[in-house]
Amino acid sequence: MLLGALFLLAITDSLAQTIPDDNTVAIIRANYLYQFSNYNDWPAENKKGPFVVGVVGNSDVFDIMVSKYASKPIGSQLLKVIGANEVLTAPHVHVLFIDRSKKAELAKYTREFRGVSTLIVTNWEGALAQGAHINFLSIDGSIRFEMNKTGMLESAITPGIKILQWAIQ
């Protein structure tokens, strides 16, 4: 029994060491980006070719998206992750995450993607009022998100039931 407890403690300690604390937030955000891709609905014309997620300003989120989620299916499409240098030249970007380190560029991206079905996700206070559709918040040590449902619908993106339930109301 004692040997089993020591083994469990060693495994738990080993797992804790494989995911650095500073990457935990990036891992959670990447998982949310994948869930947003899976549980929202885009117009039929955006359901051909790869499902593209762009990441601007956060190499940790980008690396995690590439290693864990690239090439996973989103409906009948395969998920493709692109970086900032490809975002404005891609034929279509379904989900765009803009990190707070690039918040000065939000206006440029909202102008570029106006009238296009691109879900814009951010992580700083006040971003919804500046054109973001979903914004990550840290509440009592947990990563949560708020959303602008009207903005999503105006971009022809239908929020899924799970996304609506998970969002802060």
Residue ranges and their predicted role:
Residues M1-L2, Q169:
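Absolute protein N-terminus
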